[in-house]
Amino acid sequence: NYQDWDPVHYLDVAEMTTAVAIGYDWLYDVLAPSTRQLVVHSIKTKALDLVVEEYKTGNADSWAKRETNWNVVCNTGMVLGALAIEEHYPELAKHIIGEAVRYIPNCLKHFAPDGVCYEGPAYWGYTNMYLSLLLKALNDNLGEDFGISEMVGVDKSVLYYMHSTSPSGKIFNFANSGSPSPKPLCPGIPAYN
């Protein structure tokens, strides 16, 4: 019953949509019909309706199109939301998935040639956590990931994480990474290595 999912900071919308979509999928059989309707309505009005306009009018600095972690995180959230309510809004889902697949390479092209994330280890983890969710969801629901996993460097990205971890187990402090503690290896990425 939130008024909105904080569209001013679209990462919040993406994370909320991801959580709600996964919960809706996992709990569908035990949700009351009224709760299902609320979830479908919320995903559509608080996330997907907003992204349609962003794809249409957003410039290169738009979260949907930029070359940073925001692109993968936000587009993944929208794809998961679209897949969750696809049976109710198939054309909307098709449009969102198509646009997300079109723009996600804007970020991932920077993984070429050897999987390095220019934003540093912390954002590597954030980006790849969502990338692994995206690849799994696309493959499970649509039977393909539209070539995203085949982009140059994506298959080597796990090596970047391994090489940016020091012998002490701590992440080297560079780029946008200041964590003194190691981050756990993103669980989904080894499947794509």
Please tell me what each predicted stretch does.
Residues 1-170, 177-178:
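Aromatic-lined, polymer-binding surfaces characteristic
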